[in-house]
From Swiss-Prot:
Residues 1-49 are annotated as: Disordered. Keywords: Cell membrane, Coiled coil, Cytoplasmic vesicle, Membrane, Transmembrane, Transmembrane helix, Transport. GO terms for cellular component: plasma membrane; recycling endosome membrane; trans-Golgi network membrane; transport vesicle membrane. One of its GO terms (biological process) is protein transport. Probably involved in membrane trafficking. This is Secretory carrier-associated membrane protein 5. Residues 19-49 have a biased composition (Gly residues). The chain crosses the membrane at residues 140-160, 167-187, 202-222, 250-270. It comes from the Eukaryota. It holds the Pfam family SCAMP. It is a multi-pass membrane protein. It is found in: Cell membrane; Cytoplasmic vesicle, Secretory vesicle membrane. Residues 1-139, 271-281 are cytoplasmic. It comes from Oryza sativa subsp. japonica.
Length: 281
């Protein structure tokens, strides 16, 4: 007698809960794990087998490990850079201590007090018998700084009142070059000469300081050589501008007085330094 197949009977291949299906799931999981080892890449693979068995329904999740290794490498580089920086700082401190122990003076910037840009310590570095003279020379340097600054202000007033714009640029050049050059060319050599008793420094000071006095005399006169002399607040420029604009003329007359005073003080300083040099030698 022929029996029809049971319609409610499921085949072994179609039953997801049969042993074959479980094996398929295990095979799918194993296939997913094996995929992570190929290609030589640093990654972690985790496979999920499909419910229907086999690797068709499997999903593989790859977790790259390169980011972890990169972060560790950067951390090592930062630590190495920090150690190198500390080593350099320690080396600098060791050299400074060695120079101090050897008696080499360490010049720290201390002037002006509100924004130190130069080293200046007459009370501790200049001999007591030369400190008064050094202070006088320092006043002479501050005097030329004041003269050039006032000259800049007066020329700006003249420019506003209708003067040539080139006067402004010339006054700016006088100020920007005259202030630092006067310090480097004659005041600093005199400071070094007083401190170290160097004949060469004294000679350099005398040469440059005479040029400084010549410039002060030229500025006090302001001959009509460049732009009728109005780029400097001398007597001739003051008379010329006063006839046109009284306010501008007053500014120029004040500048003329400052240059005259600076000339007289500079001649006095030159005489005093020369007498000190001759008497000291």
């Amino acid at each position: 007698m022929h029996h029809d197949p049971n319609p409610f009977d499921e085949g072994a291949d179609d039953n997801p809960f049969s042993n074959g299906g479980g094996g398929g799931a295990r095979r799918g999981g194993g296939g997913g794990g094996g995929g992570g080892g190929g290609g030589g890449k640093s990654q972690f693979s985790f496979g999920f087998g499909g419910l229907g068995g086999g690797s068709k329904g499997g999903a593989t999740v790859d977790i790259p490990l390169d980011n972890m290794s990169d972060s560790k490498g950067k951390g090592k580089e930062l630590l190495q850079w920090e150690a190198d920086l500390k080593r350099r700082e320690a080396d600098i401190r060791r050299r400074e201590e060695a120079l101090k122990s050897a008696g080499v003076p360490m010049e720290e910037k201390n002037w002006p007090p509100f924004f130190p840009i130069i080293h200046h310590d007459i009370a501790n570095e200049i001999p007591a018998n030369a400190q008064k003279l050094q202070y006088l020379a320092f006043a002479s340097w501050l005097g030329i700084v004041l003269c050039l600054f006032w000259n800049f202000i007066a020329v700006i007033v003249c420019w506003i009142r209708g003067g040539d714009s080139k006067l402004f640029f010339l006054a700016t050049i006088y100020g920007m070059l005259g202030m630092p050059l006067s310090y480097l060319m004659w005041y600093r050599p005199l400071y070094r000469a007083m401190r170290t008793d160097s004949a060469f420094s004294f000679g350099w000071f005398f040469l440059c300081y005479m040029l400084h006095i010549a410039f002060c005399v030229f500025a006090a006169i302001a001959p009509p050589v460049i732009f009728r002399g109005k780029s400097l607040t001398g007597i001739l420029a003051a008379i010329d501008t006063f006839s046109d604009h009284a306010i501008v003329g007053i500014f120029y007359f004040v500048g003329f007085a400052l240059f005259c005073l600076e000339t007289l003080v500079s001649i006095w300083v030159l005489q005093k330094v020369y007498m000190y040099f001759r008497g000291h030698k």
